[in-house]
Regions:
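Cross-family detector of peptidyl-prolyl cis-trans isomerase
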Residues: 1-153
């Protein structure tokens, strides 16, 4: 587990993603062979320009979480955004979930807030262009993400 007070991140050498787990979340991990709806709230910062370039936490998008269908196939995660409920899809015109967003799924729990002490899974990621969305890979820039994940219904 990373120490958020010391700004610690873990680097994954196989893909170049850096991850900090702020909260592992309540609930259970996505099981092998399982497909689930996962809901995300996020801020996306372009590290080249040091600006927030996309978020679904702004008032304009307050009613829309990014919904994705995630499948765990023997520990390998694949996912697509729901075209009708995704700020990422609307902004980048693609339902492909950035590979970097899937890295935490091995380590976090996906649940729903049912009791006062339940928490959403919360991570911070530094995602290189090769693991990001098409716009980031085409224009070669890394992004910093602050994301919460929860299991949908």
């Amino acid at each position: 587990k990373t120490d958020t007070t010391k700004h610690q991140y873990v680097k994954f050498n196989n893909n170049g993603v850096y991850m900090q787990i702020v909260n592992e979340g309540s609930g259970e991990k996505l099981k092998k062979g399982e497909t689930a709806t996962v809901l995300c709230r996020f801020d996306e910062t372009n590290l080249l320009t040091d600006t927030i370039q996309l978020t679904n936490r702004a008032l304009a998008w307050d009613g829309m979480v990014d919904k994705m269908m995630v499948t765990n196939t023997s520990g390998t995660f694949t996912a697509t955004f729901d075209a009708s409920s995704s700020v990422m899809k609307r902004a980048y015109r693609n339902t492909m979930v950035p590979s970097g967003w899937l890295v935490p799924l091995t380590y976090i729990n996906l649940g729903r807030i049912a009791k006062p002490d339940d928490k959403l899974a919360h991570v911070r990621l530094i995602v290189p262009s090769s693991q990001g969305h098409k716009h980031a890979s085409d224009n070669v820039y890394a992004c910093f993400y602050d994301i919460t994940y929860q299991r949908g219904v």
